[in-house]
């Protein structure tokens, strides 16, 4: 097959000498113009290897050698390199290939006959090696096509076509070019027909889709009631591009319907364009106009990304609801274009602000991207929602919030109210960098009155579904009403800054439970929650001084308890600092981090994310081990914080149950399967005792062992007549 090896490229290589046959393979290309290709083609089995050396060695060519050189020049006409885009390693080069077509290689045969011959898979009508080899490639491409695409493919290879190929991203070795003909061209001579994935399409198709989207936007925006239009973000332009988003459900729906009608009118390679876009998973798409169309069809918000909005200082919070993803277009090496979409999936995201005031977001492993324009109030609203510090997260019911979308809409509304109560111009520095350092003044939250209104709506009732207690707001248990929550473990290898904000999230989800437990133990007020900055614990965290961290947490907790005992103000972040130790920033959290705090009249297990006080027992839901519908408990006879069993809630006890079932004391051993009464909140519940973690000897195990020993002793006594 015809090709030029990368070893034959020199400074004197001309454009004509870069011409290639239809099969080629490429590697990553650095910045260069079209006359200097350091790496273009390398087909191991091609018979034109070392072409330049061969031509130089001819000297004064004979007539036969002149004929051979003429064939070489003619073979170049099959592919023309018209231009190579500047690349910084993110995208490969851009090659425009002009396929000559079989009709030019077989001028004596009718093109229609050639097309029919290809469709039936017949051999090449010519015995010339180059023509025969190219025929086999074309026949393979036609054979791999499906349905009506076979006819389109056969017509293309017979009549010739112009295609554009793009290199793979971040290539470190040999790569392939993906053509907009859906062909995968490799050096081995294989041409496969891809089905469906739009990531293997080219710029012309993307431009067509982009044009159709833009036409749809203009039609929707200029027609109908203004409330039904797709509005631009403040009408602003970012580097010549209008940043638009789909605001309301009405306009989103109208835009989706209009785009469906528009795409349904066009076909690509014999396949309906609407079907092609819809049938491609958004996770498999390149971030181009096809992805943008997919997002519009799925009513996902879109934004335009500018190069100035791709840098900034970040803070990290954990999102348990909607996941925001964005990436720049691979066809734009200047990184001034891209798309953002949001979907329901938990992940770490970071929020920051650039020097021009744009709020930025970062998704772990995906780099930085633009989320929206606004001020610190908007950023604070996002943080309140992301960290689930809004009242609705503590008082949710299935009837009020049937899905997470409605829940997060309510949380966003409450976050706006909270920030409004704070005031937009508080002058508080809440900038946080990637090391987890917060500005000197910390985050100012609420006054006592506002705190009572927005942050204390904690219900103490747990809902039972199918005979089990339902806790939390994760996807397995959205029907909960109460303050118990199953928190899934993220793993030990967590960065320090991520760990702190994961701690913020978990503490935020259990503040009501913790403070209620403290109130019961201390028999006094808990004081006012407010933020007064971050102690030395967070400042030393990045240096890994574990002893200092633990000592600081102990001291902070001691001072916090002293203030609470007298009803004085207590920093909310003081509680976070203490409970932060339950997350741990090393893989040896139990050895290096504070696991429990105990004293006269109170006990807090910071080794567990949720601790609640029931009748003489500490009921805990440990990270990573609890299942939905279960409350694990510990016994006062065993070490504090050790999981020994589970209580399965059956139903709320009625009058007859109060007389028929026992209410165990804190030190009583419970047999597995026993049904007992437990005080949960204001009501008593019938609970069935289950064994806990198999790695721990449970109360049931202890009692079974004691019973077995007693039975064996009695049997021996009977055997010997004692």
UniProtKB/Swiss-Prot annotation:
UniProt KW keywords: Host nucleus, Virion
One GO CC term, this protein: virion component
Bilayer-crossing regions: none
Chief place where the protein resides: virion
Subcellular location: Virion; Host nucleus
Role of this protein: Involved in transcription initiation and cap-stealing mechanism, in which cellular capped pre-mRNA are used to generate primers for viral transcription. Binds the cap of the target pre-RNA which is subsequently cleaved by PB1. May play a role in genome replication.
Assembly behavior: The RNA polymerase is composed of three subunits: PB1, PB2 and PA.
Protein name: Polymerase basic protein 2
Organism: Infectious salmon anemia virus (isolate Atlantic salmon/Norway/810/9/99) (ISAV)
């Amino acid at each position: 097959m015809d090709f030029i090896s990368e070893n034959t490229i020199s400074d004197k290589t001309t454009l004509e000498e870069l011409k290639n046959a239809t099969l080629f393979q490429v590697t990553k290309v650095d910045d260069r113009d079209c006359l200097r290709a350091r790496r273009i083609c390398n087909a191991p089995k091609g018979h034109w290897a070392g072409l330049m050396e061969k031509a130089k060695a001819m000297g004064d060519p004979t007539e036969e050698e002149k004929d051979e050189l003429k064939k070489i020049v003619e073979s170049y006409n099959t592919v023309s390199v018209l231009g190579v885009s500047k690349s910084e390693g993110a995208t490969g080069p851009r090659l425009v290939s002009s396929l000559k077509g079989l009709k030019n290689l077989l001028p004596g045969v009718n093109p229609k006959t050639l097309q029919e011959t290809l469709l039936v898979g017949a051999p090449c009508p010519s015995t010339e090696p180059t023509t025969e080899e190219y025929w086999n490639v074309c026949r393979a491409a036609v054979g791999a096509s499906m349905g009506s695409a076979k006819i389109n493919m056969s017509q293309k290879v017979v009549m010739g076509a112009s295609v554009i190929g793009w290199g793979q991203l971040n290539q470190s070795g040999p790569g392939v070019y993906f053509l907009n003909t859906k062909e995968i061209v490799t050096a081995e001579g294989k041409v496969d027909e891809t089905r469906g994935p739009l990531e293997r399409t080219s710029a012309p198709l993307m431009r067509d889709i982009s044009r159709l989207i833009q036409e749809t936007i203009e039609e929707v925006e200029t027609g109908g009631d203004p409330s039904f239009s797709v509005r631009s973000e403040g009408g602003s332009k970012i580097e010549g591009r209008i940043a638009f988003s789909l605001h309301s459900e009405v306009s989103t729906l109208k835009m989706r319907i209009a785009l469906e009608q528009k795409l349904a009118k066009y076909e690509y390679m014999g396949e309906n364009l609407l079907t092609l876009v819809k049938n491609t998973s958004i996770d498999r798409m390149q971030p181009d106009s096809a992805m943008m169309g997919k997002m519009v069809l799925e009513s996902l918000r879109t934004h335009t990304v500018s190069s100035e909005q791709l840098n900034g200082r970040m803070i990290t919070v954990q999102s348990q609801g909607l996941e925001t993803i964005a990436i720049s277009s691979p066809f734009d090496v200047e990184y001034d274009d891209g798309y953002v979409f949001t979907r329901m999936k938990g992940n770490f995201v970071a929020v920051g602000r650039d020097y021009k005031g744009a709020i930025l977001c970062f998704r772990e492993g995906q780099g930085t991207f633009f989320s929206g324009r606004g001020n610190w109030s908007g950023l604070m609203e996002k943080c309140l929602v992301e960290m689930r510090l809004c009242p609705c997260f503590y008082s949710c019911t299935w009837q009020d919030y049937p899905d997470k979308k409605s829940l997060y809409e309510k949380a966003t509304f409450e976050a706006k109210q909270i920030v409004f109560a704070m005031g937009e111009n508080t002058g508080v520095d809440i900038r946080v960098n990637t090391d987890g350092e917060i500005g000197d003044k910390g985050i100012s939250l609420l006054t006592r009155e506002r705190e009572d209104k927005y942050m204390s709506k904690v219900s103490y009732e747990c809902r039972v579904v199918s005979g089990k207690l339902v806790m939390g707001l994760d996807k397995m248990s959205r029907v909960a009403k109460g303050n118990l929550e199953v928190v899934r473990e993220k793993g030990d290898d967590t960065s320090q800054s991520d760990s702190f904000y994961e701690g913020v999230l978990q503490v935020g989800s259990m503040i009501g439970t913790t403070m209620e437990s403290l109130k019961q133990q201390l028999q006094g007020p808990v004081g006012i929650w407010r933020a007064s900055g971050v102690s030395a614990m967070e400042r030393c965290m990045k240096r890994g001084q574990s002893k200092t961290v633990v000592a600081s947490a102990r001291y902070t907790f001691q001072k916090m308890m002293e203030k609470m005992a007298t009803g004085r103000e207590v920093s909310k972040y003081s509680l976070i600092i203490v409970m932060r130790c339950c997350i741990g920033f090393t893989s040896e959290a139990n050895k290096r981090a504070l696991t429990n705090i105990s004293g006269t009249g109170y006990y807090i297990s910071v080794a567990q994310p949720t601790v609640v006080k029931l009748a003489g027992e500490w009921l805990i839901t440990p990270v990573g081990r609890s299942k939905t519908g279960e409350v694990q408990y510990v016994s006062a006879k065993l070490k504090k914080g050790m999981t020994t069993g589970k209580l399965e809630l059956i139903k709320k006890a009625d009058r007859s149950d109060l007389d028929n079932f026992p209410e165990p004391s804190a030190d009583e051993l419970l047999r597995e399967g026993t049904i007992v009464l437990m005080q949960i909140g204001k009501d008593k519940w019938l609970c069935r005792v289950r064994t806990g973690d198999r790695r721990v000897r449970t109360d049931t195990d202890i009692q079974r062992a004691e019973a077995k020993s007693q039975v064996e002793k009695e049997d021996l006594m009977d055997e010997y007549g004692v």
